[in-house]
Amino acid sequence: MEKLNIKDFEINTEDVIENISDVFKDTIIDITQIVDRPPLAVSIGYDDKAYGGVHYPLKFGSMGNISLITGQEKSRKTFVKSLIEACTFGGKSNFYTDTLEIKGYLGDKYLISIDTEQSLYDSVMTAKRVPHMVGSMPDNYISLMWREKSTKERLQLLEWLYMESSYKENLGMVILDGVVDCVQDFNSLTECKEFTEKLMKYTSVTNSHLCGLLHLNPNSDKIRGHLGTILGQKAEMVMIVENKGEYSECKCKVVRGGKPFKPFTIQIDDQWMPYVSDDLERLENINKENHIL
């Protein structure tokens, strides 16, 4: 069993709040105010049940919130990320989704995709998938490579992006492929909690969505380390991507404030583009036939 570090629970006197009574008053919720439901950033499919004659889209993520794409190593998480990015812009991306509608609601807001793991070659090839699938280069798509940056530099860049840059007023979604590379120790309770609090602040202040990619523990569906535990608790949606050999299955593990989207599968075509496959439907038909036999 991992030993607890008492320093993780010590209060930093530098963080003591001044004028705490005023701060307390600012946190009181006015229950008379009318608050709109957070607008969607991305949806996957539609509810089978109609409400008032309308089949509503099923949430992948909404503005002001955090989602996670998780899976074991080499489960094709980055391919799933590319598929979602392309579908967020629309264009010809529907050619890659069969009958499943993956839809974005960013308008002209920026989608900024950050990679902390891949080499220059792989980063470029990954970034090129989006314009290839969309059919053109979206004006509001930016892909960044932070592999060579230190953890401290990545944190400073994130802070600048959300709080100081010219993009902050028009951020739609940030996708962080390699969340673990933004902390020194993914098992440090204090560090991971502070980092998660920053992400929550960033998404709230800019009213944008953040989607992070994280590994699962080996042979488990639990997200790795204290970082995974804390982020998983705060995320409004957690997707698990599981490698099934020729294809990967994508399913919603948890979602807050809505119904989970239906599981779907992806394969990779001969141009290294991800597409929604019919493997689940095919397996269901085989199982039905075997049951009849």
Mark where each language-model region is.
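C-terminal regions of RecA-like/P-loop NTPase motor modules
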Residues: M1-S21, T32-I34, P38, Y167-N170, ...
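Short, flexible loop segments at the rims of nucleotide/cofactor-binding pockets, characterized by
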Residues: G45-Y46, T151-K152, N187-L189, H215-S220
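Conserved, well-folded catalytic cores of nucleic-acid-processing
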Residues: C87, G91, V130-M133, C182, ...
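Generic beta-sheet signal
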Residues: S67-I69, L111, L171-L176, S208-G212
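The Walker A/P-loop phosphate-binding site
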Residues: N12-S123, K128-V130
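Phosphate-binding/switch region of NTP-binding enzymes
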Residues: L68-T70, K74, T78-F79, G104, ...
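Conserved inter-motif catalytic segment of the P-loop NTP-binding fold
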Residues: Y96-E191, Q271-M273, D278-H291
